[in-house]
Amino acid sequence: MTRRDPMSMSTTWLAAAALLAGLCAPGAAWAQTQLRVFSGGTNQRPDLMRVLFDQYQKQNPGVTITIETGGATSELQRQYLSTVLNAKDASIDLYMIDIVNPAQYFGAGWLEPLNAWFGEPAAALKPYLPVYATSNVIDGKIAAMPAFADAMFMFYRKDLLAKHGVAEPKTWDELSAAAKKIQAAEHNPNLQGLSIQGAPIEGAVCTFLLPYWGQGKDFNDAAGKLTLDKPAAVRGLTQWLAMVDAGVIKKNVAEVKTPDTVNEFKAGQVVFAINWTWAWDRFKDDKDSTVAGKVAVMAMPTMPGGKSATCVGGWQWAMSAFSKHKAESAKLIKFLVTPEASRFLAAEGALLPTYPAVYTDAEVLKNVPWFKDAAGVAMAGKSRPMSRDYGQVSDVIRTTTSAVLARTKKPAEGVDEIDSRLRRVMR
């Protein structure tokens, strides 16, 4: 399907948006209100956020919303926002933050609790995907509200699986066997079986967690305390190395970043690829994509006897504790986290809905038919560790995972390091 111009929103959306904006009807209190919003980087689609902001401004002519963007990755955004918020900068009212950030930022006193505007956490977050009831609630306070979801999916070349009579693999060993069969039959030395992210970036946190969770294990308990099962973690890392040795994963996997996986998959050089939701549009719409119409998604494989699980990410709207326009900012957040906003972002940007019901919305499925297969994955997904020291947690997991994949550390050595360093942080 061809992406529609975001400005040509359906009349249904416009009517709903106007009604919702009307709840915040203009008045004297809104005169000359200047709101500044940090809306992330390119992957967070500031162009679509601008459409939402423009619609809000039309209904509230006393409000002007300015967008600030920056940081191509979650890590760079976290570094920038930590600097701004630590300085108690009041110039930015709202922030779009990663799902792992509420605990860190709220714990530091940087975010305004939203209970006064949204009510009790359980009721406020009940309509959304289950993961937000834990990720966005800190010490009984609503630290942020869901903007749009994200998740790691197993993308695959449905044409190649059909051509070679291969069924969707359910375990990592089955995937390895399927990939090797297709690689051998295609006689293409440049065809990778599976692409994962092994560079020391945020994606490597999920690279560590996927085969670990796939054994039915949890990394931490509800209170955030580390519950690492070391033998299971070693098995997970060993699984990746076995797939490297089998020629399924490329040998320089420790250098592979998120865009590398996207670019190589859309160039037709990969059979299976793990990546975030936004990659779908790149495969489908980019002019240089050779795989448009040839891609499908499936549940993340498991280890033997395990249960499928994936990394659920996503982006949240949070209010700065230092904002001078808190009431106005809260009204804007209410507008941005409605089912109508979720529907718009899903239909126009293939951004995963935060509301389960939107996955089956007819208009959304007309534009993004693969969402019918995404709902179960998103509902059963897990969040990366929730910690007020998430920056340190992330650094330990991703750098150690990358070192193991580079074979500068053995799996058991890497797991021992993760356990010893994080047991002091996550307790």
What do these predicted regions represent?
Residues A178-K181, A223-A254, M300:
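Glycine-centered hinge/linker elements that transmit conformational signals in sensory
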Residues A162, A184, D245, G376-R427:
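Conserved C-terminal helix/tail region of periplasmic/extracytoplasmic solute-binding proteins
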Residues N115-Y128, E186, Q192-I201, Q215-R235, ...:
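Short, solvent-exposed loop/beta-turn-alpha elements that line the ligand-binding surface or hinge
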Residues I99-A151, H187, Q192, A204-T207, ...:
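Hinge/lid segment of periplasmic solute-binding proteins
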Residues V131, S135, G293-A299, A347-T399, ...:
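Long, aromatic- and glycine/proline-rich binding clefts that accommodate carbohydrate-like moieties
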Residues Q32-N43, V63-E68, D93-L94, A143, ...:
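Short, well-ordered beta-strand elements
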Residues Q59, T64, I142, K163-H164, ...:
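Extracytoplasmic/periplasmic substrate-recognition and gating elements
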